[in-house]
Amino acid sequence: MKSDIEIAQSVPLKPITEIVKKVGIDGDDLELYGNYKAKLSFEKIKSVKGNKPGKLILVTAINPTPAGEGKSTMSIGLADALTKIGKKTMLALREPSLGPVMGIKGGAAGGGYAQVLPMEDINLHFTGDMHAITTAHNALSALIDNHLQQGNELGIDPRRIIWKRVLDLNDRSLRQVIVGLGSPVNGVPREDGFDITVASEVMAILCLATDLKDLKARLANIVIAYRYDKSPVYVRDLKVEGALALILKDAIKPNLVQTIYGTPAFVHGGPFANIAHGCNSVLATSTALRLADYTVTEAGFGADLGAEKFLNIKTPNLPKAPDAVVIVATLRALKMHGGVAKADLTFENTAAVRSGFANLKRHVENIRKFNIPVVVAINEFVTDTKAEIQVLKELCAEIAVPVELASVWAKGADGGIALANAVVSAIAEESAAYKRLYADKDSLEEKLRAIVTEIYGGRTVQFGPKAKNQLKQFAQYGWDQLPVCMAKTQYSFSDDPSLLGAPDQFDITIRELVPKTGAGFIVALTGDVMTMPGLPKIPAAMKMDVTEDGTAVGLF
């Protein structure tokens, strides 16, 4: 079998102007970045706003193994399969972060014969969105430090600046830094730090904004620091939201590319799901809904993170809720949740599949709490056995959830046809009646408790000393009306990554709350989740290269 990059490079690409005609987009509606990438114009986005939205399919997963469970690959394969069975389909995915590409992932544009193309461009600099977001974020950092240097008219307490700098790389050595060292002309010395760009509030804002006006309003509402009297300081106090929006004026436009099978795909925005809300842009998803009969999108990591945030944070900003949710499961992950060591996952173990099924079952039950139909997709691997597959199908039948085997990695669209038909049937047979898990009027504590008890299966939520004080403080500022965004390990329902399966009798401890008032949510930090990842001992970058003719090597 060829590698992902070899498959991608063997596919003859069609001009993007030809691909997008399938969904009613003309060449004049595009801002081209070469022959195979484009941004969609604001004029076209506005012109389709009156269109009735099509069906929305959200792809999520069980709690993953470190290698991931192929959620992006399944999303792409499902979209291609829907196209193949005659459905007018679009795909709406996140764009990769360069940090994990160079770190552990090596790429994030699907895999095998279910990829978005050109994969090298998408995995590297693409259309420059990450650069624009990084620049806008760090421009604000520079403006804050300049304000301190120029007399600090707003009375900002340098010890209480909460706006860190960002970089689209994994670099643990930048988590905590000191800026302003040297002579007085170098600024006011203070503690600072770096997050990865996909954890930036600017990224979240770009992904939730509905247009440039909304983008500017959200940027203005970012909390950057506190004064000596502990009152919050906003971007609007610095009067720089216009400049930040200017830097982002092109980045907010959704990017268009193609799948191997030729399905039009929006790839736009990329917040992580463990430290941010984990969904691609509202603009891309909303526009896809108004252009196609079926839109396939995804939310990062497991359904306890990405799907919960999609349904509680993103969905209220969309023209409609999902019509169906596909939960991707692999037998290797179920066996790991059933207690099998990583080294033994390739061996048949039906007992471990039965035990690990508790993880999948809880995810299915959770999605049903939102009143949305669920379909399980088994992402097939060559090490899967007939006995293990049969056991999983029987277990799914016991909880009355449709299940289909999908081999889109190996077979592309053909490997996803059964899944596509199952999803279409689920939508036709069972109407979604979406309801949120909590109301805006609920307190932050009530919202967090609902997530911990209803989604994670825990006993309750505990608050550390800092978080306890912040609950009172945030209520005074009116921020308790915002939804919550949990920053938690992706490997477990709990905040302990080693607690696999479907644990109960555990508490989640919130150590800190972070206001993301521009994005419109409050981040709750749990465990030791880092907002600036580090690199592994052997980074994927060590296997990457470029040939003399400019061909990329080692992306996967």
From Swiss-Prot:
PROSITE patterns: FTHFS_1 (PS00721), FTHFS_2 (PS00722). Keywords: ATP-binding, Ligase, Nucleotide-binding, One-carbon metabolism. It catalyses: (6S)-5,6,7,8-tetrahydrofolate + formate + ATP = (6R)-10-formyltetrahydrofolate + ADP + phosphate. InterPro entries: Formate_THF_ligase, Formate_THF_ligase_CS, P-loop_NTPase. Pfam families: FTHFS. ATP binds at residues 65-72. The keyword Nucleotide-binding applies. GO terms for biological process: tetrahydrofolate interconversion. One of its GO terms (molecular function) is ATP binding. Pathway: One-carbon metabolism; tetrahydrofolate interconversion. It is an enzyme of class 6 (ligase). Its EC number is 6.3.4.3. Belongs to the formate--tetrahydrofolate ligase family. This is Formate--tetrahydrofolate ligase. It comes from Streptococcus equi subsp. zooepidemicus (strain MGCS10565). The gene is fhs.
